[in-house]
């Protein structure tokens, strides 16, 4: 008998790492161009617009939307089964396990809002191109929007980087307590680095650094 749960969990982690992790990294690196000002970010966004619309839409659906739906739906199933007891046990791994689930729930709501507004409504319905000026106006329009956007980005970064360590353990790449501890430490270092970059480009919309 085929163990469907075994393969589903591995596919879930693989999709999260490659498809969604790749999209997050592209998102962060592109937005980091804002540190160089409007011209730098608009130049990056203009390069993406050079991709033919049918191909770009196909990539959005096939490489992002469908993997996200699978990761989200199966992730909800995992969350519903998970039992988090960070305060009872107090171990770092258990806290990471809990935060992985908590950020998953938050990200589900955040991405519906963020993608629904910017990609589907502003760009899709209104036909307004995404530019530095638009993003700046968006994130500085209200302290609530800024805080929610920043928390959403940081939650996505933690979910991704902690997911890397989980992926390495799930797939048997790192074995033993020492190797797993090193993997966890490296993933948190990456989390800190990406978080600092994100905070920097978010703040730059208020105080240009170029």
Tell where the protein language model's regions lie, with residue ranges.
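Membrane-embedded alpha-helical bundles that constitute the cytochrome b-like, heme-associated redox core
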Residues: 1-210
């Amino acid at each position: 008998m085929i163990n469907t749960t075994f393969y589903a969990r591995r596919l879930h982690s693989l999709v999260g790492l490659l498809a969604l992790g790749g999209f997050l990294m592209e998102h962060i690196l592109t937005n980091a161009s804002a540190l160089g000002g409007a011209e730098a970010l608009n130049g990056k966004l203009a390069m993406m617009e050079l991709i033919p619309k049918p191909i770009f839409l196909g990539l959005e659906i096939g490489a992002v939307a469908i993997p996200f739906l699978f990761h989200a739906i199966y992730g909800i199933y995992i969350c519903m089964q998970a039992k988090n007891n960070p305060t009872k046990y107090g171990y770092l791994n258990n806290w990471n396990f809990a935060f992985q689930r908590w950020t998953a729930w938050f990200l589900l709501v955040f991405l519906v809002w963020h993608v629904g507004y910017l990609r589907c409504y502003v760009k899709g319905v209104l036909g307004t191109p995404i530019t530095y000026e638009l993003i700046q106006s968006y994130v500085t329009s209200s302290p609530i929007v800024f805080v929610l956007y920043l928390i959403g980005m940081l939650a996505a970064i933690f979910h991704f980087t902690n997911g890397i360590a989980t992926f390495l353990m799930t797939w048997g790449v790192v074995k033993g307590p020492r190797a797993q501890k090193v993997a966890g430490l490296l993933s948190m270092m990456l989390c800190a680095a990406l978080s600092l970059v994100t905070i920097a480009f978010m703040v730059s919309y208020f105080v240009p650094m170029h």
